Amino acid sequence: MGGSESTGRKVSFGMDEEERVRVLRGVRLSDEVVTRMKDQSTWAASGAASGSATVPSKVGSSASHPAAASKDGAHKPTAAGVGHQYAEEDLYRRYEREQTLIQEELARLAKREKDAAHQRLSTSILREKKMADQERRKAEHLPADLDEWAKDLEHKEAELQNLNTFYREQLSSIEKKNLEIYRLTEEQFHTAATNAELRVKQRSYDPVCMDLQSNILKCYAENKQERLNCSDLAKEYQKCVSAAQKNLLFNHG
């Protein structure tokens, strides 16, 4: 009973007030085992009582036939000796039954602990296997992801290169246009300046009203304190200048 796991196991147990095993190695027996032990102890006690009741009847019969006893010449055991021997045998059988129950309880506890440990180990193994599968799948997808990332980078680099080329071409075109505009503007400026200079040189003007101008200057010099004396000359000079301007506008209009 108990299997190979309980063979050779040293068990220490304690007895309660009714001399029944209750605790072994700090492990308390279950109620089911205690109930079975109680039932078997009750059965053993009833068997011992019936055995002790039958012993005196045998003794009485032997006493009623002393001649037969003496005739055989054999020594018969007394009732007390027979009862003591039966009690020892019953105690031994009780001890064996209790040992069997203890071995069964130990086997049950060992099996429960083994199952719990196996369950924990299985859960841990499954968790580690799941994590390993996840890492493996990540590792399998990683090269494909790297290739895709590399392609994306190449595509973006190509787009940037195209944009750089486009902007360089646009900048070069703008610089060329600006240079052409500058040259054209410079040519137009020089042409306009040359034409203006030619027009100015072609027009030569003689002084107008020179006589009146000389008379006014002379009058002002002679009449420094009384400038009003030269007012008539000034009016004539203004009329002469106005007439000369009109003639100039009319001739070049």
Curated annotation (Swiss-Prot):
Keywords: Coiled coil, Disulfide bond, Lipoprotein, Membrane, Mitochondrion, Mitochondrion inner membrane, Myristate. A motif (Cx9C motif 1) lies at residues 209-219. Residues 87-116 form a coiled coil. One of its GO terms (cellular component) is MICOS complex. A motif (Cx9C motif 2) lies at residues 230-240. It holds the Pfam family MIC19_MIC25. Residues 206-248 form the CHCH domain. Its main location: mitochondrion. It is a lipid-anchor. Residues 38-82 are annotated as: Disordered. Residues 44-53 have a biased composition (Low complexity). A lipid is attached at residue 2 (N-myristoyl glycine). Component of the MICOS complex, a large protein complex of the mitochondrial inner membrane that plays crucial roles in the maintenance of crista junctions, inner membrane architecture, and formation of contact sites to the outer membrane. This is MICOS complex subunit mic25-b. It comes from Xenopus laevis (African clawed frog). The gene is chchd6-b.
